[in-house]
């Protein structure tokens, strides 16, 4: 579905599934505010939430596009925002559920992940917001040798483990426990489960 916004005589177009109408309208508002005075910055990267978007000319209109995070193709720009808007929706829902909405810390597609050996080969694993910039992911079973550690960027791992999108903006020192692809609990800095 096309969502259209008129800005200073220019038509901005954003494409997304109808179920993301609220998120699409919010995204258009963000882009509109950015470009109200900056039409010379068309085709410039605009950081927002997990990633970045840009506005490109399309005929006489302007199309809002986003990097292809779903398929890990950062050099490819897509018109359909559904995948990106779903990421935004999930993080906001998690912020509300864990009562951390006003304390969420940005984490971007190029953010570092440190992953312990064998993590995704076991059923039970955890993710720890080590600091504002880094997540550490490891098996819960401490008898499994975590070495060697592997460094990745979020966009390389998150599409295969989309449950990580939900929790990526949680505050520093929060720990999330998983069974398979399901979040089992979210422990705050006082080790209180704020998920259940």
At which residue positions do the language-model features occur?
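Acidic, proline/glycine-rich low-complexity IDRs
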Residues: 1-196
